[in-house]
Amino acid sequence: MGVFTYENDTTSTVPPAKLFKAVVHDADLIVPKVVDSIKTVEILEGNGGPGTVKKLTFVEGGQTLYVLHKVEAIDDAKFEYNYSIVGGVGISDIVEKISFEAKLFEGPNGGSVGKMIVKYHTKGDAKPIEKEVEEGKAKGDALFKAIEAYVLANPNYN
């Protein structure tokens, strides 16, 4: 198995505690409202904490696809969230899983800085397809910004 690591940083004007709550604890409700392609997020097993497996159903290229999202760790005090995409028909055949390590920090002017480490665990000695990696980064950035926009548009969100 090969492991290929990529890092991505982003910023937000939303404070870390509020953004973490939206991205981690309320995302199952927010995401289908703010991302047209994502139709449902359902818990298949667990209670939302580590070990929970979620099914994200989305439409891409006119096809209904899904991925299985496994929660690995949540640390509310440190604003850390680790999860993996562990299966589904929306994941490349050469990928065993994709692991994400996300952390929010205090940013300038009361906002946040987000750091994401993404690890592609490939089958055998296969390398991730660069186009798929770039598309994944773009989708992740768009998802983050959509949740941020929801929080900003709903000032009473807590």
Curated annotation (Swiss-Prot):
The keyword Glycoprotein does not apply. One of its GO terms (cellular component) is nucleus. Transmembrane segments: none annotated. The keyword DNA-binding does not apply. CDD domains: Bet_v1-like (cd07816). One of its GO terms (biological process) is defense response. Keywords: Pathogenesis-related protein, Plant defense. GO terms for molecular function: abscisic acid binding; protein phosphatase inhibitor activity; signaling receptor activity. Belongs to the BetVI family. This is ABA-responsive protein ABR18. It comes from Pisum sativum (Garden pea).
